Amino acid sequence: EQLTVQVDRPATILIPTMAGVRVSSDKGLTALLVAVLVMCGGRLAAASNLVPAVYVFGDSTVDVGMNVTLPLPYGIDLPHDFLPTGRVSNGYNLADYISRQLGFKNSPPPYLSLTPHTSHQILRGLGGVSYASGGSGILNNTLIMETSISLAEQVKFFADTKLQMTQYARGKDSGAALDELLAESLFLISAGGNDFFLHIANPDSSDSIFQENLLSNFTKHVQTLYDLGARRFGIVGVPPVGCVPAVRVRVPFGLCLPHANKIVREFNSMVGEMMANFSTDPEQPGSGMTYSVGSSYNVLMNFTRDPTANGFTVVRRACCGDGLLGAENPCKHNSTVCRNRATHLYWDFAHSTQATAEKGAAIIFNAPVEENFTAPINFQQLVSPRQHGSGGFSSA
């Protein structure tokens, strides 16, 4: 299957959809399991990690196997005991590397694949849960795959987790302890790219109406998480969708699609303004929270414009796939796979390589704000103890 994108020039952009995926069948999640793994896992990890837990929401940029399992060559560079995986990459993804920056081994496990074994790993120090689902979007009708789980549903899953945690924590002062745990945890959100892909492919409204609708829905999700106890938000903005191989392959000379990138930049600015108002206006429900917006757009455009300085040699072509720029046919078991994956920006027609995720996470986490990769603070400052007081958080 392919999505057809009409542009305002003699070109047609074909965005291949995912192939060869299967739905995860292990959905045995019990109230006790969730309560124990989140509460205890976070507490045991607090001594060595920068936050007690990480809760991940979004799309394939941070999905670690919520609803699909991808066959090789996806995950080709992961340890053998890590397979199968739902990461849309040759290896680890952004959620993994941000979690590592926080002191964890990898991203927390996916909500619908928790087992007694994975809960044991969490009890040993990996706190939190991933609700992120590949192919999902901010809008409820943005579902690239039948198994994709919208951001709204992901937030509902967290609400269920919170309820189960509350039921488990019935002791004296348990409510305050739970509030403290959630306030000190990181809520990581990386979503919106698929919404833009579908809008570019088949716009059913003007760009401005689409952006306002997207922002309204995103704001609702942030507010719901805040109402459920989230106080520390790490937002990863929408990447430059106009520069992915699937778009470039149908644009003359393999260039980026300027209009697509323009409306993404505008939306990212809108999100930054919304978060600023949400966190500082005393009349807004989010007063008292702290946040950082990481610009995946600026990070990837920096890699694209100055690849050599960032360790890349190929920034237009997909590492795995066939046809022009490796993007006319999706990555599958018999596809051509590049050998130098560490120097490729893109893994397949629309997703980054492990190398891109690792370098991008390091920049979002550590780069000075003056370099315009994060605002108003970077992720390291977001989880710094000195941010607890300014954001209304208690120290761990």
Language-model features: locations:
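Intrinsically disordered, low-complexity basic segments at termini and long loops, enriched
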Residues: 1-17
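Conserved active-site regions of diverse hydrolases
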Residues: 13-396
